Amino acid sequence: MLLEGEGGGGPALQGTVSVNPPAITKYETVNVDVTVSGLLTSHRVFVQCQSDLENGLVCVAAYCPVNGTLRFRISNWSSNGIDGAARTWAYQAYV
C-alpha cells in the first residue's frame, strides 16, 4: 500500500509475531508490546490477526512507540472479562 506522495515499492519490514494479550476486564484497553528488530518510530505499521479474535476483542491501534517495539492496543468492548489466546499476527512497516 502506497500513501499519497510516496513513490517507493513494498514494505521496509514485514513478518509475523505472536501476540498474547493478558486477561482484559470489560470495557478496558491494554497495550501488548512485542519485539520487532529494525522497526523504527518513523514507520507506519499495518497489522492483521491471522485467525479470529475472541468476540469482544478489537485491535484499535498498532504502532512503534520506541525503536524495536511493536505495540498493539487491544480493547475489550464486551460486558465480560476476556482472556484472549495467543495468536499469530502479520505486520508490514512502511517508511
Stretches found by the model and what they are:
Residues 1-39, 67-70, 75-95:
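Extracellular receptor-binding modules and their adjoining Ser/Thr/Gly/Asp/Asn-rich linkers
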Residues 53-66:
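Low-complexity "stalk/linker" and mucin-like segments enriched in Ser/Thr/Pro/Ala/Gly
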